Amino acid sequence: MSPVVSERLLSFDNRIVNQEELNRIGINLDFDKLDLSLNLSLSRDDARQNQFSFDVPYEKPLYSEAGLFSWHNIFNLTTNYIDSELDTSQLDWRVEWISNGNIGGYQGLNLESSVYAVPDELNLDESMKIYRGDIRAFVDRPEYPLRFTIGDITPYSAGHLPSTTLGGISMERLWNRLQPTRNIKSGGSQDIYLVESATVGVYINGTFYGDIRLPPGRYSIDDLPLRQGDNDILLSIRYQSGRREEITYSQFFNTRLLKKGFSDYGIYAGVISEVVEREYSYDTDQTVGQLYYDYGLTDSLTIGLNGLYHNLGQIAGFSLGIGTGDSNIGFRGSILSYSESQESDSFGYIASIDFSTILWGNLNSSSANFRSSFESFYDYRSTPWQTEDDIESGNRGLVSYTYRLYNNVNLNTYVQVDTFQDPVRYDITGQLELEINYFGFDVTLGIEHQQNYDLVTSDETTYYAIIGWDWYSDDGNYEFLAQYFTRENVTRATFNKYSSNTVGSYGYQLNAERSDILQSYEARANYVGNRYSAEIDVSRFDDNEGVFTANSVSGRLSTGFTMVDSDISWNRGYRGPTAIVSVHDSLEVPVHINEFIGDSPEAIATSTLSNSVPLYSGHSSSSFDVSIPDAPIGYDYGSGYYQITPGTYTGHVVHVGSDEAKTVIGSLVDINGKPIGLRNGIVSGEGVTRSIFTNKAGRFAIDRMKSGTFKVTIIGKLQYTGILVIDDVDKNLIYLNPVALKEVLP
């Protein structure tokens, strides 16, 4: 409450205050006749304003004890049966083994690898083909922070540097991974690498464009169905092992602003690597060195340098980021050198300026509604050494503006102009959209004009509409989505029942899509078990002309295996740091992990077979709970709450239950039978030391005890000593006869 209200309350002193007096100072007190309760609330003007900031000071984490050796494994099995009129293999399958490990704790050696097996269709003498994915080893130094990596690496593409994949070494200052709780206003890499099979949901500018089922591999954002210019993209990735991830980015250049005094950099060196027919190829004739360095001169000004060396081409560039309140300006410039003989000059350049701000018509939204970008390039090729690509000169400019008429009505405009030299050509694209959102309905009405001047001149105007309805149940477990796209005359409907990450959870999805070309139907169901997850889907594709029909059935199974020193567990597949929950032999009932009211547990461990719980984020604190609903009466297994700060791939072991799980209740008396009340002391023996307290009647209760003989010492002005015996019985709640103590004479 505000200080004024506090002072008025104090002025009432100790007298009785009626409801009207409380209402006058902004305190509302209402009596609920249904449940006989009092509801107390403050008026808005009299409530104290609390300020919350995510810019909290960084505190160096206190890392938890980890195993010397940890090994995390995910095993995925995928089978597909296709019945079609095309001459293709009907039965297909794939086995995936994704492995991560750590030796030596959070500052030790981390390992990443993956191995896959598929039918060998080219070699009839062998039944399967085994190939690998990216393999790398790295060491973290989170206090700096720095990561040193050797193996298959993907450098961060700063400025105009191309996206490359190398076999080599790197040194990176990965703030967001090694110090994830520190706020430096830094962005992250936008590369996409799927280490295991996944279903990728594609959302572009808020519109769902469908799911793509992808096997493990490297994928470029250029492979997605994006339009030129402004694209706000969300990739919702659902891995086969059950892990989920979301990647969001914009096709506009994202200016990186660092806090004053903070730097971010990466240094990479190696040879070009390519994956051809699932085989890794390292071209030792193509050596690459790449680096970037960004530094925050002030909180609103960041400068950067970047460069790349290749024996057939080099790039040197700079970047400048300026933040001015609601606006951001980014400058990038690069000079390119080509070493091979060619008709054009041996040097080229590219310069870009990107601007975003909040303009009139943004209502109360804090996101930028005006974006513009201009780029000029001369004798430019994005990857200098790829001589098969053309060298181009020209300019590119685009402007995007959103006018928010109401909270649910937007007017979007977009214009892009591309001009090229030698030969002279240009492309102009203009777009105007009216977007209306109302009670789950999303209606977009648009007009697009495209004009191209090349060897063939074209001028086309298109009118289109996108109509959708998205419904969620109140509990968020069910969704129905219906969409219609006039451009391709596509109608799509999807009904989802989402599963949760708990034992026994299940989900399903029904999809139907129809267009002028084809129609497709799909039914998918998934189940989350205690130590595995499974998914099955059935689909059908029909060519509307009756030329092609295909039916397919797919099944996917995922499980995991974790080892930390000598402890092992069978669990669902988890990537990242993990804690094994090991149950003591004295517990013959299951232990539930992360069981919340009204939900099933996320996992169940038993004394015969341990289970694991993911810690999700390395170098920051993670917590989980264990509970034992069927625990024996009196069995003490502690608070059940565990908090662990892991490294990137460290493994941890939590022991639930022990021999010291008995609860003992009794009383202390002196040799005359008089209660020793309101006293404290120590109970020790059998390797156990516990505190003891008595009430006025001399009664006490001690938890976490074991069977055996113990010495009782009562301290204070009058000291007592004696022996307490706990018999070896199966019961965990034990009531003792009065324990007689002798007074210790001075």
Predicted segments with their positions:
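Repeated loop/turn-to-beta-strand initiation elements of outer-membrane beta-barrel proteins
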Residues: 103-112, 143-148, 198-200, 299-304, ...
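Structured interaction patches on ligand/partner-binding surfaces of diverse proteins
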Residues: 245-251, 603-606, 630-652, 716-744
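Short Pro-Gly-centered beta-turn/loop motif in secreted/extracellular proteins
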Residues: 224-230, 607-636, 648, 696-711, ...
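Outer-membrane beta-barrel "beta-signal"
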Residues: 459-481, 493, 552-564
